């Protein structure tokens, strides 16, 4: 009986299934077709998938496919590098043409602690097309980014050998700089966060900027720039934005050796046109005769007499033209890469060399990089990478205004053409007709400085090690998508500088008046007796310059070395998984980093005349000067991120980071930096695609978040002490105030502030991305606003001497920055192989000061609430020129002028500029009186 019932049930189910077959057949259609590219070549391996299901197939070698699809279902056809297309059943098309994705929306973009599809980005993140920088011969990677990404400014670089460019992202939000480094962004290379503020002597350097500039372009895989609240994932150090760099790894295939070599020429585009010798003499004569301050000299007596002017017509000592040369730049890279199913590898070495345009300037650098990624098992991966660089820069020791060689161009440019370099054996000190007017160049001779054996050498060495271990839970159906990763990074950076300077002899004319006595060569056909009686004498200040101030020394040798030792550890749990139309991702990471820097400096002065430049072979006549400093800091951070996407249309991201900094007191160690962003891909909406056909892609973005800064030196919350040799007590019986030797005493370095804490920077951003004309023309528009609050600033006000220390930094500054960015890009191709791109980047930015350390006795130049950081240029307001004495009389009468630039009316001459009487003297309440008839540079300047 039991078996009969089972038999009846089975027959009933079979009949029901047979009866349902026509219905199933009626609701399911077979979709057949072929997928081609724009040249109608088959696309092999294109994915055909029923949206919201796991049902799908791929095209064969001829681009053909077959798929059963129920009525009303959508099918998406996609392939990497092409724009996906969707169709709804029933289907009428059998030939599907996929267009190339010029916008690369499926491209994976590196973001903080991971990657995302470009189409899923919700923040203001710019990517740099690295192919555009591969063939640029430059010693500074930053200089190659100029114009390639919106919202970044690139300044400097490549004008001199070894000079790095600097990058700023958007409008900076700083009221007080710390050595100039904290205006720069944070640099993250292969996951390692480089220190931004490492003290070298009395200045700060950004190790990340140096590491970025030293990268060989041939090893760079991607560059991403975080400009808005998306940078909050890096917390405390990301207030000025973040630049993320990923270097290349080996790709599946046989070993591949590649060579890339570039040669470049560095030369001037234009040069200011200077007066020739004759014009120079005529100008100085005119200036002399119009100078109202030369009351003791007959104004009709010219500086250069007519016979001198005639001779100067044939004098043309253009030293800049003599020494300027086109400079060669070259870069060579050799890379080896490859991969198997079990491992990938990449190794490379490169050499860069750059000569200078003036004299003995040169810079060269070696780079190396080697890394391997190993698949230990199906679910375990490991990687290790070693990289570094060694650079050397040589410059002459310029002794004009300091030891820097930066003034050589301006000095040669303004060199009067009538003055030669040498007269016989005498090296001439180049300067103009009067000492006071050209005191900054009166002891300069380019040839002597290039060949006297003095030098300034800088050597840098950087080594980095990155290692990681990853475990994938893909074997577990419940934990699929979860990965655990541990990374360790270490960098050692060394900077050495050697300076060697000796005295040198320059000469100039003993007398400076009379016919023929302004020239260094006899005048042909004239009475040269005055010249023959003129003697040369030694310029007594032709001596080395130390620490930007002239010292009465005969020479010096200095050495300095900075070593920075840093490490970073991360433990990260990352999860990414799709559930139908839902895509979920997230990560949690613990990060610890420490930095230790040591600086050593030594200098000895007044060696005997001959030396090999080695300190142990020189007998010194002075006590060596030495300095040693050591700094350390550490950070502990917790990072979290959550991403959600529905049907690639609705995008949401939450970020949070909690940082600790030992720069603050223990109760203020921690800062919390969250952010949220959202995006809506409007062009994915069915109603949009049916009604708006001229827009191919449209996405709206919005973000808001908090970042911070620890803008101070370490241990300011603890009382620290220094020593002072000159202000200690004096013991003895003498009644003189400074008799005897002062005892060395301890002093407070600064008052403490345990309440000092993180700066806060709230960042808001609205973005719009849209493409038209078959995705060939794209626009990206961003508007941003940043509220900088509780900024840690110093007080300029003096404190009572009884305090015994300078005032501490306090969190009170407020500054707003804002701007708009627009990027327009046209991408197209001619024929099958020729592709081109035209890109325009533009924008506007500004700032507004709300609270800062206002001047206690403000002047009209003082900052006021609502002012910009950049106050522009101040100067006198010119309203004309005195062309006659009648003009002078009318001006003095009309405006009741009693004093004009320190002169009475009788001393004012035609040819002088007319300045406006803007205001009077400053009043007791801080305001200024109206025009008072006194025109002076102190009270009458305006913002030009």
Predicted feature locations:
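Conserved small-residue
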Residues: 258-312, 514, 716, 723-728, ...
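Contiguous N-terminal and early-domain "leader" segments and peripheral loops that mark the onset or edge
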Residues: 121, 154-209, 290-351, 355, ...
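Active-site-proximal flexible loops/turns
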Residues: 44, 197, 267, 394, ...
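Long, charge-rich C-terminal accessory regions
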Residues: 504-505
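Short, small/polar-rich motifs associated with maturation and membrane association
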Residues: 2-369, 381-383, 387-389, 402, ...
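Short helix/loop capping segments that flank catalytic or ligand/cofactor-binding pockets
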Residues: 178, 197, 234, 267-269, ...
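Extracellular/periplasmic, surface-exposed regions of secreted and cell-surface proteins
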Residues: 330, 365, 371-380, 385-390, ...
């Amino acid at each position: 009986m039991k078996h009969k019932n089972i038999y009846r049930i089975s027959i009933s189910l079979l009949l029901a299934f047979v009866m349902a077959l026509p219905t199933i057949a009626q609701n399911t259609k077979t979709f057949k077709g072929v997928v081609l590219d724009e040249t109608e070549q088959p696309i092999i391996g294109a994915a055909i998938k029923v949206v919201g299901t796991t049902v799908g197939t791929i095209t064969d070698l001829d681009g053909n496919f077959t798929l059963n699809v129920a009525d009303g279902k959508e099918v998406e056809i996609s392939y990497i590098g092409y724009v996906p297309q969707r169709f709804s059943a029933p289907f009428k098309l059998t030939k599907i043409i996929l267009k190339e994705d010029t916008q690369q929306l499926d491209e994976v973009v590196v973001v903080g602690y991971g990657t995302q599809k470009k189409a899923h980005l919700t923040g203001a993140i710019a990517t740099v097309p690295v192919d555009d920088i591969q063939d640029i011969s430059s010693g500074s990677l930053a200089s190659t980014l100029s114009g390639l990404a919106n919202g970044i400014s690139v300044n400097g670089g490549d004008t001199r050998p070894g000079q790095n460019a600097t990058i700023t992202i958007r409008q900076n939000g700083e009221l007080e700089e710390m050595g100039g480094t904290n205006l720069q962004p944070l640099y993250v290379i292969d996951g390692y966060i480089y220190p931004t503020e490492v003290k070298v002597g009395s200045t700060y350097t950004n190790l990340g900027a140096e590491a970025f500039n030293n990268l060989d372009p041939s090893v760079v895989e991607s560059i991403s720039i975080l400009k808005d609240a998306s940078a909050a994932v890096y917390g405390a150090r990301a207030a000025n934005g973040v630049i993320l760099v990923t270097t290349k790894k080996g790709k599946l295939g046989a070993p591949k050796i590649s060579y890339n070599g570039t040669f470049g020429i560095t030369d001037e585009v234009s040069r200011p046109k200077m007066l020739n010798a004759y014009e120079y003499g005529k100008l100085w004569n005119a200036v002399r005769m119009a100078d109202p301050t030369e009351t003791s000299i007959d104004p009709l007596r010219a500086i250069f007499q007519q016979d001198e002017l005639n001779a100067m017509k044939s004098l043309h000592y253009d030293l800049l033209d003599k020494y300027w040369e086109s400079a060669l730049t070259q870069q060579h890279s050799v890379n080896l890469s490859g991969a198997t199913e079990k491992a990938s590898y990449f190794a490379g070495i490169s050499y860069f060399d750059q000569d200078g345009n003036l004299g003995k300037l040169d810079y060269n650098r070696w780079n190396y990089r080697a890394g391997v990624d190993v698949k230990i098992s199906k679910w375990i991966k490991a990687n290790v990478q070693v990289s570094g660089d060694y650079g050397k820069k040589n410059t002459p020791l310029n002794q004009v205004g300091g030891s820097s060689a930066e003034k050589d161009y301006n000095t040669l440019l303004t060199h009067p053409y009538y003055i030669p370099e040498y007269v016989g054996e005498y090296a001439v000190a180049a300067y103009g007709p009067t000492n006071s007017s050209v005191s900054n160049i009166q002891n300069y001779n380019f040839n002597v400085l290039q060949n006297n054996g003095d030098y300034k050498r800088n050597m840098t060495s950087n080594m980095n090690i990155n290692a990681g271990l990853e475990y994938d839970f893909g074997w577990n159906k419940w934990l699929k998508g979860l990965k655990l990763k541990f990374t360790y990074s270490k960098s050692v950076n060394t900077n050495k500088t050697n300076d060697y300077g000796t005295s040198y002899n320059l000469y100039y004319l003993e007398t400076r008046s009379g016919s023929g006595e302004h020239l260094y060569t006899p005048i042909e056909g004239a009475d040269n007796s005055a010249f023959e009686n003129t003697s040369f004498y030694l310029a007594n200040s032709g001596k080395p310059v130390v620490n930007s101030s002239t010292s009465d020394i005969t020479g010096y040798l200095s050495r300095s070395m900075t070593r920075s030792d840093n490490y970073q550890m991360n433990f990260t749990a990352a999860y990414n998984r799709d559930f139908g139309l839902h895509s979920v991702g997230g990560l949690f990471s613990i990060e610890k980093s420490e930095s230790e820097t040591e600086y050593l400096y030594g200098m000895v002065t007044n060696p005997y005349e001959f030396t090999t430049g080695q300190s142990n072979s020189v007998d010194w006549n002075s006590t060596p000067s030495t300095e040693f400093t050591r700094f350390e800091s550490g950070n502990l951070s917790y990072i979290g991120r959550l991403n959600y996407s529905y049907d690639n249309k609705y995008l949401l991201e939450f970020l949070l980071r909690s940082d600790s900094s030992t720069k603050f007191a223990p109760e203020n160690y921690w800062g919390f930096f969250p952010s949220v962003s959202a995006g809506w891909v409007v062009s994915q909406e069915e109603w949009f695609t049916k009604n708006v056909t001229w827009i191919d892609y449209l996405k709206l973005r919005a973000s808001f978040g908090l970042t911070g800064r620890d803008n101070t030196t370490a241990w300011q919350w603890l009382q620290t002490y220094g020593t002072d040799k000159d202000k200690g007590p004096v013991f003895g019986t003498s009644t003189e105030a400074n008799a005897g030797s002062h005892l060395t005493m301890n002093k407070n370095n600064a008052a403490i502030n345990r309440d000092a804490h993180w700066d806060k920077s709230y960042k808001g951003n609205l973005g719009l991305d849209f493409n038209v004309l078959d995705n060939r023309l794209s626009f990206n528009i961003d508007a941003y606003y940043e509220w900088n609050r509780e900024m840690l600033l110093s007080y300029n006000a003096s404190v009572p001497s009884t305090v015994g220390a300078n005032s501490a930094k306090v969190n009170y500054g407020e500054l707003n920055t804002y701007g708009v960015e627009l990027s327009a890009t046209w991408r197209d191709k001619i024929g099958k192989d020729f592709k081109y791109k035209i890109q325009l980047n533009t924008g506007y930015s500004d700032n507004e000061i709300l609270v800062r350390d206002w001047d206690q006795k403000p002047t009209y130049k003082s900052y006021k609430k609502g002012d910009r950081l950049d106050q522009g240029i101040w100067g006198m307001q010119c309203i004309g020129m005195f062309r006659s004495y009648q003009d002078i009389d009318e001006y003095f009468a009309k405006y009741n002028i009693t004093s004009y630039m320190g002169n009475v009316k009788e001393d004012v001459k035609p040819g002088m500029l007319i300045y406006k009487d803007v205001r009077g003297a400053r009043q007791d309440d801080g305001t200024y009186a109206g025009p008072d008839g006194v025109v002076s540079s102190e009270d009458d300047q305006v913002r030009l």
